[in-house]
Amino acid sequence: RCHFVVCTTDCRRNSPGTYGECVKKEKGKECVCKS
């Protein structure tokens, strides 16, 4: 499972102030940024 903390960290690295949301991709799960 994609953890929220991991998503948040990834999003902050690219876009500070955003939160991460886990979405299902063909290869496992991937984190995307949501404002």
Curated annotation (Swiss-Prot):
Keyword Secreted attached: yes
Pfam families the UniProt entry points to: Toxin_32
Keywords: Disulfide bond, Ion channel impairing toxin, Neurotoxin, Potassium channel impairing toxin, Secreted, Toxin, Voltage-gated potassium channel impairing toxin
InterPro entries registered for this protein in UniProt: Toxin_32 (IPR012636)
Entry GO terms, CC: extracellular region
GO molecular function: potassium channel inhibitor activity; toxin activity
Cell location: Secreted
Disulfide partners: C2-C22, C7-C31, C11-C33
Tissue: Expressed by the venom gland.
Family recorded in the similarity comment: Belongs to the short scorpion toxin superfamily. Potassium channel inhibitor family.
Function as written in the Swiss-Prot or TrEMBL entry: Blocks Kv1.6/KCNA6 potassium channels.
Protein name: Tamulustoxin
Species, as recorded: Hottentotta tamulus (Eastern Indian scorpion)
